[in-house]
């Protein structure tokens, strides 16, 4: 999962002063789940780093724990609003009748499929035979088997990373901006920012029906576009990530015709 | 923090240029670290208390979960218990805290992770001639943990990147104010920073070697076996390169994360002499080692000969055979020739199989290839007899129906 995250992060890094970007893909037949659906959220992979003066990302255990708790709470609240029944896994062994290995296998399989999605949908290696086909990926039988055993309709995989710029780096940024007055300008040394993705799998067919990536940050160290350490920040990220699920291409076209 | 990591791509680091200038100011050679100076920096039951280390350990928890659940692991319980006992012996004060995993990767390596779990590659078990050699590698890896190398190198990296960032910003602002272009100096400083990071990494490897030698001798193993391991590795790489008409990469570059193997071997010899107490009995516990790896030794040899590196494979088999030939080694020696398939190798392999089956412990496959070679040479009756023997030893072999047809 982490590798997938890094690859996507590199792809979406646009040297803008500060922005929030999302880019979602859906199966052509996808209709966002509404009403009485059962959603299984696989262990959300959450990390919060502190960005050192030199620009290194240092993982912070306390912030990470805080953010994970907040993200899970925000997810539960959001799905409840939509009418779905949600179970959020914190460990691999929480599903009755499903072994830890089976969950681990599915996570790894999703990571591999997700890498393909990243490569062919986000990193520019577009496949000519797949144009206008929407999101055309599947986790296959394993996902269907999980759905059959547990009775869930969808599985959601999620990754979120937030990097908080340290005081030293902000000071360095101030110096860089101050330098502009003497002719040495470094107004955007960057470093912080958020990155997240979510992937929705239909457990009846095994297909990855919806995929979204959010990037929020600025190239000016110290200016934040959200902070998942706070409940509000987490709710904001979850909303950005899952709030506006667009239906698939064919569903949209059918809706337009009507 | 691995036993021998692969170097970074040099080209990627050369982008800034100025390599020659920087090389003049940074030497590659460094003094040997004395085992006597290597005191463990942590005690039993160590838990991180600093923020950065807690963060690192938290990340490692997830890594360990992935490693522990990986299907690349060899899970033979007796063998794993043996390895766990070994790290429990040579692990110093943290002996009881470390975990060990055995990965099915036919390569010579071992890695220690920051939170105290080690991954041993199966290729390592093939190459070790006795328990002392294996314990040496494990002691080296334990040395990384005991000397807190991961967090120390992370802090070193943090400190140097901070200094570089502040320095280059200050330099730029100062240059801007005075109207001097400082870009070249900044690039040189960047290279200097990178070089000093690699130097620090090599120093830690040298520390782990010294610490390892000490742990080994303390536990009654001959410490010289660590130097022997390097001698074998250098020999293997030479043989592999010679076969491909190339030269071995001698290491020792400015960008090496580990000291050059030759230098490590030389230092380890001196260190071994230092930690050896005259009059004390040291035992390499070879029999115990062979006993422990016996269930997987055939698989290890099989993995190796299929790597398509006949130079290295032949050297390895000959090195293992210095402690005595047996049917298994003879069979795989012949396999190296057969798979190499140079002019005359088929005859050489046929002779090899014939020699192998003379040993009581020859694997069933030796009889199979012996039989097929005989038939190829026109000795039908003898060939069939050998194949019949193969079927008797392995009646459920995947190719049994075909062989049965050949025999009937």
Predicted regions and their residues:
Chain A
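Positively charged n-region of N-terminal signal peptides that target proteins for export
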Residues: 1-4
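Bacterial N-terminal signal peptides
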Residues: 7-16
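Homeobox/homeodomain signature
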Residues: 9, 29, 96-99, 191
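A generic alpha-helix propensity feature with a strong bias for hydrophobic helices
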Residues: 15-18, 99
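C-terminal/domain-edge helix-coil "capping" segments
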Residues: 19-51, 70, 139-153, 159-258
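N-terminal segment of the mature soluble domain
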Residues: 54-164, 203, 207
């Amino acid at each position: 999962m982490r590798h997938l995250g890094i690859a996507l992060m590199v792809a979406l890094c646009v040297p803008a002063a500060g922005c929030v970007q999302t880019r979602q893909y859906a199966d052509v037949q996808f209709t966002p789940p509404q009403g009485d659906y059962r959603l299984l959220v696989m262990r959300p992979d959450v990390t919060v780093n502190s960005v050192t003066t030199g620009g290194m990302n240092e993982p912070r255990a306390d912030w990470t724990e805080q953010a994970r708790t907040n993200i899970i709470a925000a997810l539960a609240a959001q799905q409840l609003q939509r009418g779905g029944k949600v179970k959020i896994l914190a460990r691999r062994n929480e599903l009755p009748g499903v072994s830890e290995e089976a969950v681990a296998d599915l996570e790894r399989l999703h990571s591999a499929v997700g890498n393909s999605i990243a490569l062919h949908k986000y990193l520019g290696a577009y496949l000519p035979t797949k144009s206008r086909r929407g999101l055309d990926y599947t986790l296959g039988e394993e996902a269907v088997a999980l759905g059959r055993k547990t009775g869930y309709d969808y599985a959601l995989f999620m990754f979120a990373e937030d990097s908080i710029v340290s005081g030293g780096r902000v000071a360095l940024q101030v110096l860089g901006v101050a330098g502009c007055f003497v002719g040495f300008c470094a107004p955007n040394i960057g470093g912080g920012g958020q990155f997240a993705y979510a992937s929705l799998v239909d457990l009846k067919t095994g297909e990855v029906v919806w995929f979204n990536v959010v990037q929020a940050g600025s190239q000016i160290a110290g200016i934040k576009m959200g902070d998942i350490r706070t409940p509000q920040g987490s709710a904001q990220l979850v909303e950005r990530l899952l709030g506006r699920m667009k239906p698939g291409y064919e569903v949209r076209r059918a809706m337009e015709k009507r | 923090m691995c036993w021998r990591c692969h170097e970074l791509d040099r080209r990627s680091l050369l982008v800034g240029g100025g390599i020659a200038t920087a090389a003049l100011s940074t030497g590659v050679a460094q003094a040997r670290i004395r085992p006597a100076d290597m005191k463990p920096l942590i005690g039993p039951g160590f838990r991180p208390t600093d923020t950065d280390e807690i963060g690192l350990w938290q990340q490692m928890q997830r890594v360990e979960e992935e490693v522990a659940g990986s299907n690349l692991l060899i899970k033979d319980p007796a063998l794993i218990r043996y390895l766990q006992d070994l790290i429990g012996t040579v692990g110093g004060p943290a002996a009881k805290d470390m975990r060990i995993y055995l990965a099915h990767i036919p390569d010579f390596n071992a890695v220690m992770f920051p939170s105290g779990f080690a991954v041993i590659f199966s290729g390592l078990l093939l190459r070790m001639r006795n328990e002392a050699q294996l314990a040496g590698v494990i002691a080296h890896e334990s040395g990384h943990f005991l000397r807190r190398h991961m967090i120390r190198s992370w802090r070193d990296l943090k400190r140097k990147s901070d200094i570089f960032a502040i320095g280059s910003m200050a330099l730029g602002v100062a240059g801007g104010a005075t109207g001097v272009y400082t870009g070249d100096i900044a690039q040189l400083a960047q290279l200097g920073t990178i070089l000093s990071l690699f130097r620090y990494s090599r120093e830690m490897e040298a520390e782990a070697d010294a610490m390892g030698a000490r742990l080994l001798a303390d536990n009654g193993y001959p410490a010289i076996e660590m130097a022997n391991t390097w001698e074998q590795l250098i020999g293997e790489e030479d043989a592999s390169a010679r076969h491909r008409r190339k030269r071995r990469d001698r290491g020792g570059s400015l960008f090496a994360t580990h000291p050059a193997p030759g230098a490590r071997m030389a230092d380890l010899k001196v260190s071994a002499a230092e930690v050896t107490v005259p009059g004390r009995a040291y035992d390499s516990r070879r029999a115990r080692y062979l006993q422990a790896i016996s269930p997987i030794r055939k698989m290890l040899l099989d993995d190796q000969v299929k790597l398509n590196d006949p130079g290295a494979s032949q050297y390895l088999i000959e090195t293992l055979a210095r402690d005595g030939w047996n049917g298994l080694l003879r069979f795989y020696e012949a396999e190296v020739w057969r798979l190499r398939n140079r002019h005359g190798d088929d005859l050489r392999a046929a002779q090899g199989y014939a020699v192998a089956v003379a040993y009581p412990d020859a694997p069933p496959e030796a009889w199979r290839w012996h039989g097929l070679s005989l038939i190829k040479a026109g000795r039908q009756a003898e060939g069939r007899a050998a194949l019949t023997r193969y079927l008797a030893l392995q009646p459920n072999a995947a190719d049994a129906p075909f062989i049965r047809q050949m025999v009937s």
